[in-house]
Amino acid sequence: MTGFVLFAHGSRVETANQAVRDVATQMAARGKHVVEPAFLELGKPDLAGAVERLVAAGAGRIVVIPYFLTLGTHLQRDLPKLVSESAAVHGHVEFEVTPPLDGHPALVEVLLSRAREAVQHSLEAL
């Protein structure tokens, strides 16, 4: 079985962390796969905890999906270290990390949608 981790930074604002958990739940419902949220800091579970849950559920392959817009320090330095640590603990599990969100055509569509909403809202206010 392939399991997925939606990996986010984490926030002191719990509603922001809950929003990530909600996205993971929505992904699981739409994709019919097990999707666990995980946080670099300021949220639970961390990556190791999410991996443990997926392995316990029978995952032999884990795909980590960064919920980050761009490839910054956390994705270049911190995430590879955390994945390596989990791979050392779970040697029988295959790990893969996807690219961040930047460059995906759907992101441009989401941003344009927000811009259209703002313009429409401004026109309605006149």
List the model feature ranges, each with a label.
Residues M1-L126:
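Active-site-proximal alpha-helix that buttresses catalytic centers in soluble enzyme cores
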